[in-house]
A protein has these predicted regions:
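ABC ATPase C-loop
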Residues: 159-160
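ABC ATPase NBD Q-loop/coupling interface
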Residues: 59-75, 143
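Conserved beta-strand-loop-alpha-helix hinge in the C-terminal portion
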Residues: 215, 219, 223-246
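Conserved structural motif at the start of ABC-family nucleotide-binding domains
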Residues: 2-4, 17-19
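Short coil-to-beta microelement around the adenine-binding A-loop and adjacent beta1/P-loop entry
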Residues: 14-15, 74, 182
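The feature captures the beta-strand-to-loop junction immediately N-terminal to the Walker
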Residues: 33-38
Length: 251
């Protein structure tokens, strides 16, 4: 599904990604952990095409297509989804209109007919149940006046509606209490299929206990320096990153 080869990227004159190699197959969940400033959020931003970042070297293929040649909106239409660490508010734009426009833009890109109102409302009802989203939230402006937990739940609802092939959750657990985290994790788990994959970027293993990735990668100074299974997240939670720095020859 996703193949990243020797990816280098910078913002301004500062190089942040310094040779990322990563392969994600259909149906896999990968977690990316690492100290602050290691490049985790930069990687997600580069994958979705944030224009603030410049790719200076490397290749990225998404389902066999050159991702780096695509516009950000085309990456989304191809099935890439990013859940932001800090979701933005869009006053005056209702969730219903926002989601209907997003879905029909994707359908247009794929050569499909627009979804009519009845089909859309039925889909909205089905997906709202999955993430336990209050119908009142679905009728308000996008994220306006939402609590932190409501914003995150709303993003998982958007993910459910858009049915992406690869979802990137960038510190979705940031600021969530355990109950809200469980609802987010349950939603993500229910949406996983053998054809869809997920990247979970996090500092903590609590979310990973609920989502359970098959692979855990440690990003440090712009490179993936260690890969393991769920047990790696446990070791990091208990012992921090110093032992990994020692392992790769850094103090």
């Amino acid at each position: 599904m996703l193949e990243v080869k020797n990816l280098h990227a910078k913002i301004g004159e500062k190089e942040i990604l310094k040779g990322i190699d990563l392969v994600i197959n259909d149906g896999e969940t990968h977690a990316i952990m690492g100290p602050n400033g290691s490049g985790k959020s930069t990687l997600s931003a580069v994958l979705v095409g944030n224009p603030l970042y410049e790719v200076t070297e490397g290749e990225v293929y998404f389902n066999g297509k050159n991702l780096l040649e695509m516009k950000p909106e085309d990456r989304a239409h191809e099935g890439l989804f990013l859940s932001f660490q800090y979701p933005v508010e869009i006053p005056g734009v209702s969730m219903t209109n926002f989601m209907k426009a997003a879905i029909n833009e994707k359908r247009k890109y794929l050569g499909l007919e627009p979804m009519n109102a009845a089909e859309f409302l039925q889909l909205q009802r089905e997906k709202r149940k999955i993430v336990e989203l209050d119908s009142k939230l679905a009728n308000r402006s996008v994220n306006e006046g939402f609590s932190g937990g409501e914003k995150k739940r709303n993003e998982i609802f958007q993910m459910a509606m858009l049915e992406p092939k690869l979802s990137i959750l960038d510190e979705t657990d940031s600021g969530l209490d355990v109950d809200a985290m469980r609802i987010v994790a349950d939603g993500v788990n229910k949406l996983q299929t053998p054809e869809t994959s997920c990247i979970v970027i996090t500092h903590y293993d609590r979310l990973l206990e609920m989502i359970r990735p098959q692979f855990v990668h440690v990003l440090y100074k712009g490179r993936i320096v260690k890969t393991g299974g769920p047990e790696l997240a446990k070791e990091i939670q208990e012992h921090g990153y110093d032992w990994i720095k020692e392992e790769i020859g850094e103090e």
